[in-house]
Amino acid sequence: MITLFRIDFRLLHFQTAQVWPQKTGANEIVVANDSVAKDALRISLMKMSAPHGCKLKIIPVAEAITYLNSEASKERKIELLVETTHDALRIAEAVEGITALNAALMKGGEGKKMVSPSLAFAPEDFENFRKILAKGIRVESYVAPDDRPVPIEKYL
């Protein structure tokens, strides 16, 4: 069962490794990212950040989809972390039962529009969020558990 599905360009860091699992009761963190799954240094750093008593998987998106659709995942309380709306959409389209997505931190850069202090959208992000919303998934932006959620529609 997915307890938190979050877009965060930093993926695993203090808040996602320590604060969120306590808030959601997650006993497993799945980092779904194709490039990180091949990067031994980043994997090593993330493993050092993982909370005690919480299983950590760092796997490509396709493998995450397979796992999230398996019976084994149904027995876990999973915090699912992705870096981009593209990866979030891939998962939203392929995994049943997702009801919510937290758009927390999306990095700025050339060609991106800052829509809030923590969110910068590339043109494709607007469309990806619309597709996720069309699946009936609630998408809200908040960084910390006690922040007030802002519906993503405000920024589209």
Regions found by a protein language model. Name each.
Residues 94, 99-156:
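Glycine-rich, aromatic-bearing surface loops/beta-hairpins
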Residues 7, 49, 53-57, 67-81, ...:
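Short basic, glycine-rich beta-strand/loop surfaces that mediate nucleic-acid
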Residues 13, 33-34, 69, 78-81, ...:
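C-terminal catalytic "cap/lid" subdomain
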Residues 5-7, 31, 57-60, 80, ...:
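General beta-strand structural signal in soluble alpha/beta enzymes
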Residues 58-104:
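Ordered, amphipathic secondary-structure segments that act as subunit-interaction surfaces
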Residues 9, 33-36, 60-64, 85-86, ...:
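Short, ordered loop/turn segments at secondary-structure junctions
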